[in-house]
Amino acid sequence: MTNIRKSHPLMKIVNNAFIDLPAPSNISSWWNFGSLLGVCLILQILTGLFLAMHYTSDTTTAFSSVTHICRDVNYGWIIRYMHANGASMFFICLYMHVGRGLYYGSYTFLETWNIGVILLLTVMATAFMGYVLPWGQMSFWGATVITNLLSAIPYIGTNLVEWIWGGFSVDKATLTRFFAFHFILPFIITAIAMVHLLFLHETGSNNPTGISSDADKIPFHPYYTIKDILGTLLLILALMLLVLFAPDLLGDPDNYTPANPLNTPPHIKPEWYFLFAYAILRSIPNKLGGVLALAFSILILILIPLLHTSKQRSMMFRPLSQCLFWTLVADLLTLTWIGGQPVEHPYITIGQLASIMYFLLILVLMPTAGTVENKLLKW
């Protein structure tokens, strides 16, 4: 008799994806972030569900309902802070996951990569809308500033913004629809993530060397299940350290002031994980130019497979490209720092230089390094 996990229609799918899946024997801890993102998503859906049971999406009561969750609901404070800081952990894992893909050439799996970019954009949209829900000062003004960017689109811009707002300013209608979208999007993300996994399992995982691992595969269970469990424990440890010892470390104090349309905060800025893109947006004096640069800073990921010039897939044996990759990481950290600073000298200049450097590295320097390395191979 065949094993039930191999014969049962449902168990068979799980078995082929998580148990008997042939995996490369040499994938490092950088390959843990996929499963960690899955854990983050489940955690966010669960904590979010419990928050939604007590939250009200009305401008008059939204702020009070969040306060009520923290003060009066049993363990409401821990659920709220796990959800808020869980978003930060989600983005740390996301950026690590994308960075791993860039470094080891995983973007040559085109379908998997492009669906990954769609996932990134969807998660960013979800996080942005979630930040609006507590209806604090930064929630309100963040929503106003970011949605207003669409007014830079010629001809239809103003109508588009008013359509998204559901009126002539960010108000009751905006908050209600943002809550509706914030609730539904994680489930859509789950569905897209399944497609992401489906395409990955068509080709099998990449590995640090970037060469085919068909000759040396091991079963996913128990080797990588135990490795993923360790990763998950470390993730939860990091999250709980943040939640229990410094819950407001990554938040903005302005969001503890209820939203007031008549009083603009001195420095409007998004959550830390959007600061790099915000810095690129601010570094261009023209509104439409800034919006285009902002969009392109993320959408540039779609072009990465086209910009691959090297004969080698991974950067493991390419010191020049490695150097540029870590320069790009440093550049993104610089942009993140600049995004949180006021718009004044010298931050403006640093931001502009870092923005130019970002596009220059990806579009010019890294493809050039690939070509140079190909030439060096012939020496």
UniProtKB/Swiss-Prot annotation:
Cofactor(s) for this UniProt protein: heme b
Database matches in InterPro entries: Cyt_b/b6_C, Cyt_b/b6_C_sf, Cyt_b/b6_N, Cytb/b6-like_sf, Cytochrome_b, Cytochrome_b_C_euk/bac, Cytochrome_b_N_euk/bac, Di-haem_cyt_TM
GO biological process, one term: mitochondrial electron transport, ubiquinol to cytochrome c
GO MF entries: metal ion binding; ubiquinol-cytochrome-c reductase activity
Signal peptide: none
Cofactor note (record): Binds 2 heme b groups non-covalently.
Residue numbers binding heme b b566: H97, H196
Gene Ontology CC, one term: respiratory chain complex III
Binding site for heme b b562: H83, H182
A Pfam family the protein falls into: Cytochrome_B
Binding site for a ubiquinone: H201
Keywords: Electron transport, Heme, Iron, Membrane, Metal-binding, Mitochondrion, Mitochondrion inner membrane, Respiratory chain, Transmembrane, Transmembrane helix, Transport, Ubiquinone
The keyword Transport is assigned to this record: yes
Family matches, as PANTHER family: CYTOCHROME B
Function text: Component of the ubiquinol-cytochrome c reductase complex (complex III or cytochrome b-c1 complex) that is part of the mitochondrial respiratory chain. The b-c1 complex mediates electron transfer from ubiquinol to cytochrome c. Contributes to the generation of a proton gradient across the mitochondrial membrane that is then used for ATP synthesis.
Sequence similarity: Belongs to the cytochrome b family.
Protein name per Swiss-Prot or TrEMBL: Cytochrome b
Provenance organism: Bos gaurus frontalis
